[in-house]
């Protein structure tokens, strides 16, 4: 799966810190 899957998607703090995963 992709790092940014889930209810918050790429708007979550973790995904902002790891944007290349999106």
Curated annotation (Swiss-Prot):
GO CC annotations, alphabetized: extracellular region
Keyword Lyase: no
Transmembrane regions: none
In-chain residues carrying the UniProt-annotated modification Cysteine amide: 22
UniProt-annotated site: Important for activity, residues: 13
Molecular function as annotated in GO: sodium channel regulator activity; toxin activity
Top-level taxon in the UniProt lineage: Eukaryota
Alphabetically ordered keywords of this record: Amidation, Disulfide bond, Ion channel impairing toxin, Neurotoxin, Secreted, Toxin, Voltage-gated sodium channel impairing toxin
Tissue: Expressed by the venom duct.
Disulphide-bonded residues: 3-15, 4-21, 10-22
Compartments (UniProt record): Secreted
Principal location listed in the UniProt entry: secreted
Protein's job: Mu-conotoxins block voltage-gated sodium channels (Nav). This synthetic toxin inhibits tetrodotoxin-resistant and -sensitive voltage-gated sodium channels. This block is very slowly reversible. Causes seizures and paralysis, when injected intracranially into mice.
Family the UniProt entry places it in: Belongs to the conotoxin M superfamily.
Free-text comment on this protein's domains from its UniProt entry: The cysteine framework is III (CC-C-C-CC).
Protein name: Mu-conotoxin CIIIA
